[in-house]
Design a protein with these regions (language model features):
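Membrane topogenic helices and adjacent juxtamembrane segments
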Residues: 1-25
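Short basic alpha-helical hairpin corresponding to helix-turn-helix/winged-helix-like nucleic-acid-binding
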Residues: 20-45
Length: 93
């Protein structure tokens, strides 16, 4: 169900990225009680942030999480848009 929700959310996501996002959602205890749509979105955002941006490097350099999120938001939205996602990051995402 999460895989189907993810494909509706991000129809152009590459297959290897899709599997990583789905695996993250399935393995996350916190997402196990979420709806498939919510689990797909939260896993997708976390995957893109931690895997495809400089977010973790910014944290290592001493930026707080909110600042690091701000600096990677535009890149994340570019990736999400390229994968066919219509939704954009909200300030709390």
């Amino acid at each position: 169900m999460i895989d189907a929700a993810l494909l509706r959310l991000a129809p152009a996501i590459p297959p290897h990225e899709r599997m990583a996002v789905v695996d993250h959602a399935i393995d996350s205890r916190g997402l196990s009680i979420a709806s498939p749509e919510t689990a797909a979105w939260l896993s997708l955002v976390a995957y893109v942030r931690h895997t495809l941006t400089d977010y973790d490097e910014l944290l290592i350099e001493g930026y707080d999480a909110d600042s690091a999120r701000h600096f990677v938001a535009a890149r994340m939205n570019e990736i999400l848009q390229a994968w066919g996602v219509r939704r954009r990051l909200a300030p709390r995402d």
